[in-house]
């Protein structure tokens, strides 16, 4: 990406800030709180408000992962694999059915966002780039991935405006407020930890973070069955 922002990643590298591991922890905790609310206590709206913080952070981290991974294809395959593995736990926890195709888990959205960045980066023409955006976002809506086309566009906005922290925060916040509205507007709170990102990696236990997603859904499903 060309251009310089007032505050680049290098400028924000300091002892004060959040590394990638810390952001993952925040996203994970807020996601679990959100799912506790959605699955066990839907009447407690505050849990869902806290949970709105999770997706923008995951979207941001996928964009950073795209830039830092040594192998984008393996990264995409990993996201797709966990999307498939997580679908039954996701459907059981949210609908009580083994497979329900009306709503797919967020790993499909993250995969689609990564796919869009990879395809877009390979295009040299405006027409080719536009086709990539339309094709992948349409795919997201067709398979009914979590957050749909807008979720994919949020990931893409973090990619396009990566070097301008204020612009990407403004655009992503605008999407959450105007495209989703209501409770989802509280996703703008995710801008705070994202703005504190210092560009550093931190502890590397990515498979643990991936594995917790289907496992916590299964645990919540079993708790719901026992209640």
Language-model features: where?
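Alpha-helical transmembrane segments and their immediate juxtamembrane cytosolic regions
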Residues: 1-227
């Amino acid at each position: 990406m060309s251009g310089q922002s007032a505050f680049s990643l290098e400028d924000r590298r300091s002892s004060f800030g959040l590394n990638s591991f810390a952001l993952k922890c925040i996203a994970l905790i807020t996601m679990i709180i959100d799912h506790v609310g959605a699955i066990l206590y839907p009447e407690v709206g505050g849990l869902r408000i806290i949970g709105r913080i999770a997706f923008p952070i995951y979207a941001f981290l996928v964009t950073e992962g795209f830039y830092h991974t040594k192998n984008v294809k393996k990264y995409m395959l990993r996201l797709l694999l966990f999307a498939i593995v997580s679908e039954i736990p996701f459907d059981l926890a949210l609908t009580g059915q083994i497979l329900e195709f009306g709503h797919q888990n967020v790993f499909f959205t993250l995969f689609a966002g990564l796919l869009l960045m990879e395809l877009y980066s390979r295009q040299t023409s405006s027409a080719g780039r536009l086709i990539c955006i339309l094709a992948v976002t349409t795919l997201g809506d067709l398979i009914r991935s979590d957050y749909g086309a807008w979720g994919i566009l949020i990931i893409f906005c973090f990619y396009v405006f990566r070097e301008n922290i204020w612009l990407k925060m403004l655009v992503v916040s605008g999407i959450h407020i105007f495209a989703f509205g209501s409770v989802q507007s509280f996703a703008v709170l995710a801008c705070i930890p994202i703005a504190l990102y210092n560009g550093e990696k931190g502890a590397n236990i990515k498979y643990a973070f991936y594995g917790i997603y289907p496992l916590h859904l299964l645990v919540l499903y079993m708790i719901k069955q026992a209640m």
